[in-house]
Amino acid sequence: MGSLSRFVGRRARRTLLLALLTTRMIPVVSILIPIYLGLQRLQLLNTRTGLILTYGGLLLPFVIWILEGFYRGFPAELEEAAAIDGCSRLRTFTRIVLPLSTNSLFAAGAFAFIASWSDFIVGLVLTTSEAAWPISVVLAQSLNPISEPSWGLLNSAGLIAALVPAVMAFVLRRTVMRGMLSGALKG
């Protein structure tokens, strides 16, 4: 990510970011069949690993877009000072860039988690066993059309499902705001 912001020319960087954002405009429903067939071929259908890989692939352009703003505004002087002190690129990244980018990483991770937590269609299509169902599919499957659902249990489960991202957002609110704003200002 840092290499995209630092070493790629402005025109190429804009083209790459536009291509990433364009992939986010493709409806997920239109690519579910190829994802399904790919996971079936890899024998990852109906597994949590398959869901994690799918959500990771679907949310990666969004996360890259969020982090690019931070890395674009990252001061090159810090990297140059580390190079003068004898740090390799890897050590510069692990000792300087990564610790300073934790807020942005938390912000991107929080957005990705909430997007995958609240998604329904991917979990419904790619899983059939109850063990691999995400919470949104569990709640939907509990609405049995044959018998009267237990509304108290369903409401309690819905509240718990809504509390997880709410508590996470509350706990990480300052970190997420710092991460969102860290790449927002120029200069």
Per-range role (PLM):
Residues 1-187:
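A structural signal for multi-pass alpha-helical bundles of membrane permease subunits
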